[in-house]
């Protein structure tokens, strides 16, 4: 019986982690390709510097997760990417807590690009 409870808790935990953040728009990598040259958006890659150097998109500024996002302009849309979508989701949460209104997460990250 306790094994089933543990399994249920693990499933609920991972389901919760995968849920989109309230107030954060999610786009696919195909949608990203259509907006990459939009000068009204700020593109942020939250992977490590090494990951970014190995395979980064030139439109994205590398600001690793855990860095200070408060210097980004709050009047522009912030589009966030990472390797798989998990770190970018965390960064989107941080941006929302800092008062950013227009935040977009790229689903699947660079792995899907």
Predicted features by range, described:
Residues 1-42, 46-53:
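Flexible, polar/low-complexity N-terminal or interdomain linker segments that lie immediately upstream
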Residues 27, 56-58, 86, 90:
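Residues at secondary-structure transition points
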Residues 27, 63, 106:
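Hydrophobic residues at beta-strand termini and immediately following loops
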Residues 37, 56-57, 111:
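A generic structural signal for secondary-structure junctions
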Residues 52-58, 70-74:
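Short loop/helix-cap segments at secondary-structure boundaries that form the rim of catalytic
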Residues 58-65:
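A short alpha/beta connector and helix-capping loop motif
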Residues 67-113:
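Catalytic cysteine-centered active loop of the rhodanese-like fold, especially the PTP/DSP P-loop
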């Amino acid at each position: 019986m306790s094994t089933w409870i543990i399994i249920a808790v693990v499933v609920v935990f991972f389901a919760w982690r995968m849920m989109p953040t309230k107030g954060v728009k999610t786009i696919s990598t195909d949608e990203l390709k259509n907006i990459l040259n939009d000068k009204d958006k700020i593109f942020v890659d939250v992977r490590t510097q090494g990951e970014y150097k190995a395979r980064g998109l030139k439109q994205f500024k590398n600001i690793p997760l855990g860095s200070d996002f408060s210097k980004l302009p709050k009047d522009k849309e912030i589009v966030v990417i990472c390797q798989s979508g998990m770190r970018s989701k965390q960064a989107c949460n941080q941006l929302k807590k800092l008062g950013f209104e227009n935040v977009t997460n790229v689903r699947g990250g660079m792995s899907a690009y």
